[in-house]
Amino acid sequence: IQEVKKLAAKKGFVIYDEPYKLNIWGFRANSNIPNSFDDEIHIFTNIAKTGRPVWSYLVFKCTTDPGTYWLRNPMNPQGTAILNPGQYINSHGLGLHRGKYKALVQIGRVSVTRDYDRDAILDFNNGKVVTGLYGINIHRASKVGDTIRVDKYSAGCQVFKNGGDFDFFMKLCEVHRKAHGNKFTYTLVDERMESRKSLKNLAIGAALVALVFGGFFLIAPDNNTNEDE
C-alpha cells in the first residue's frame, strides 16, 4: 500500500480511506503481447470503522487491453478502444454487462486511444485519443475458472481472468454501494510508461553524477598544481 500511496501522491491521484470504499486500480504490464491476461487489478479498502485505517489489499489477474479478435475486427471504424492511463472519478457503477450479468459498467467519461491499423498489435502510442462514453466496463471472461486467451472477451474493457475472483469482487462492490452509493472510481497505471520515466530519471541522474565527478576531476589537477607552486 505504501508504494501505491507514493505513486498516487506523485500523480495527484485520490486514495479513498473511508471505511469499505473501494480503491480499484488497474496495472497494465510492461508488455505489448496481445491476447493475454498479463495485467493486474488491485483492490484495496480501509476495513477499520474508526481510528487509523486498516488496509485490506487484494490483487487479481486481468487484462486492461482488447483481445486480438477486436483489434483485427473493430466495432468502431476509427479502431478498437484502448483505455488511457489515468484516474477516472466516479466513472463506473454496478449494472449489467451487455445486459447479461452484473458488472461495473461505465457511467462517466474516460479517454481511449483508437487502434486503427487492425494488425492485432497493441499500439499504445499511436492512434487518435478521444474522450467519452464507450462501454469500457469491468467484467469477467469465462464464468467458471481461468480463461487463457482474451480473444472476444475484451473490446477495450477491463476483464478478470478468473470467474471466481470476479464474483468475489462483485460482493465487495455491493458492500461499497450500500455504504457509499453506486459510483466507483477506476485508476489505470501503465507500468511501461512508469518504467520509461524511471529509466529516463535514472539516465538524467547518472549524467548529473558524471558531470559532477567529471567536473571534480577537471578542477582537481589545477588545484594540485597551485598547491605544488
Where are these regions (language model features)?
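Residues immediately within or flanking Cys/His clusters that coordinate Zn2+
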Residues: S154
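Helix-capping/helix-break motifs at membrane-protein junctions
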Residues: K161-N162
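Cell wall/extracellular polymer interaction/catalysis modules
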Residues: I1-D151, D165-E174, H180-F184, E191-M193
